[in-house]
């Protein structure tokens, strides 16, 4: 009887899968394909999220000091103004004060450079760039092309590629023709 059972089992194994089995197999294959697709999409979504978070982290790190840096810009401007207006007659005490102000300005400039803060100081005669400059007035001028920077009132600054403060400038305009 044991041999008989073995023969029966072999016959069952040799039999072609039934329609039910084929249906079940087709369903299982479809489920496998669906799960593979979900896995691929989930993996891609995780990768995109990781990249987005890395970019946000890098931007936060790069621009975290922007607000603080904006507040220091006026300090830098005031130090530069103080150095630009040194008296003609200098005694030892005034020279020492000027040297101290210069050292402070130099140190602040080093810190700006360390944190990728660049001064925007347009050349006289260069074209006005609304991305970097703020024009406060237009002046008749024939020496330079219209919309050229004629006066820099205040330097601008940027941190990496982000503008902290535009340079304040006066630009030329084409003079009116006399009739």
From Swiss-Prot:
Entry annotated with the keyword Chaperone: yes
Biased composition (Basic and acidic residues): 11-22
Keywords of the record: Chaperone, Cytoplasm, Stress response
Primary residence: cytoplasm
Region of interest called Disordered, as start-end residue ranges on this chain: 1-22
Pfam families: GrpE (PF01025)
GO cellular component terms, semicolon-separated: cytoplasm
Localization of this protein: Cytoplasm
Database matches in InterPro entries: GrpE (IPR000740), GrpE_coiled_coil (IPR013805), GrpE_head (IPR009012)
Disulfide bridge positions per record: none
Record-level GO BP terms: protein folding; protein import into mitochondrial matrix
Gene Ontology MF terms in the entry: adenyl-nucleotide exchange factor activity; protein homodimerization activity; protein-folding chaperone binding; unfolded protein binding
Transmembrane segments: none
Domain of life: Bacteria
Function noted in UniProt: Participates actively in the response to hyperosmotic and heat shock by preventing the aggregation of stress-denatured proteins, in association with DnaK and GrpE. It is the nucleotide exchange factor for DnaK and may function as a thermosensor. Unfolded proteins bind initially to DnaJ; upon interaction with the DnaJ-bound protein, DnaK hydrolyzes its bound ATP, resulting in the formation of a stable complex. GrpE releases ADP from DnaK; ATP binding to DnaK triggers the release of the substrate protein, thus completing the reaction cycle.
UniProt record similarity statement: Belongs to the GrpE family.
Assembly mode: Homodimer.
Protein name: Protein GrpE
